[in-house]
């Protein structure tokens, strides 16, 4: 299970594309396809510049009306799912 201290990145075999206000990810090796809503898209955008989940949580708390506990739980669950699908990896 991830913690907020984790640092993640998008693997080289994963391509991303913006489609409207959503982001689509495709793992070219496994064929795994994943779509992110606008909040998930913002998470992915920040992941590429911040890397550390703690920094991403702090930034998103400034942008979205949500409790820290809820945001952390939601982002950790999303990151775990993306790790398991090969769409993220440890940095």
Task: Explain the meaning of each model-derived region.
Residues 1-41, 45, 91:
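Acidic, low-complexity/disordered tracts enriched in E/D and polar residues
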Residues 32-91:
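Long, charge-rich, low-complexity alpha-helical segments
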């Amino acid at each position: 299970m991830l913690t907020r201290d984790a640092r993640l990145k998008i693997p080289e075999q994963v391509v991303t594309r913006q489609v409207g206000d959503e982001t689509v990810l495709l793992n070219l090796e496994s064929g795994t396809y994943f779509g992110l809503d606008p909040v998930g898209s913002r998470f992915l955008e920040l992941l590429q510049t911040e890397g550390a989940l703690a920094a991403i949580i702090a930034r998103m708390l400034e942008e979205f009306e949500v409790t820290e506990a809820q945001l952390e739980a939601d982002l950790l669950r999303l990151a775990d799912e993306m790790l398991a699908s090969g769409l993220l990896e440890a940095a």
